[in-house]
Amino acid sequence: MSKLKISYSDLDSLSKKIYDKVRPNFCPDIVLGIGSGGWLPAKLVNNHFNVEIESIQVSCYNNRELSNIVESNFSKINSNYIINKKILIIDDVNDTGTTLGYVVDKLYNLACGEIELCAAVMHHKDKEKKYDILSDIRTRYEYANLADDVWIDYPWESN
């Protein structure tokens, strides 16, 4: 399988690209990094926004069905904390869409719909998704780069 190798320098450029796409129409109260791949991208994007930052751990395994997602630790991400907030969700890659779909559902339901969401990723894989974030009216969506369906080798990946 071919790989797309990403350097730390690339991540800086990609985070600036996300900021430039998101900022004109959405200024978050909170940047939320989905771990573990979205933690560093969230920090880098938040260097531009300079707002509160939170992180969650969400894992998706096997055939990437929603039922296979390991329940995340939403720590202080509860309805009182997020209601009427603008939250920018950051992850490294949108592969099947399952993780983003889970997080959008969870946040939207916790806030009883009283929330503004924007999700952004470093790479959006150009393939069919289990969850089509582009057609979900509950959230805006941006990505820095469109990628082929190849392995994306981020600096934090073990080889």
Predicted regions and their residues:
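Active-site-facing substrate-recognition patch
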Residues: 1-28, 63
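Internal catalytic-core helix/loop-beta-alpha segment
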Residues: 81-123
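Short, well-ordered alpha-helices that flank and scaffold nucleotide-derived cofactor binding pockets
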Residues: 20, 43, 47, 105-109
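Short, glycine/charge-rich flexible loops or terminal/linker lids adjacent to PRPP-binding catalytic cores
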Residues: 15, 50-87, 98-103
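Glycine/proline-rich, flexible active-site/cofactor-binding loop segments
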Residues: 25, 29-58
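Conserved acidic residues
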Residues: 29, 85, 140
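PRPP-dependent phosphoribosyltransferase catalytic core
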Residues: 2-4, 105-159
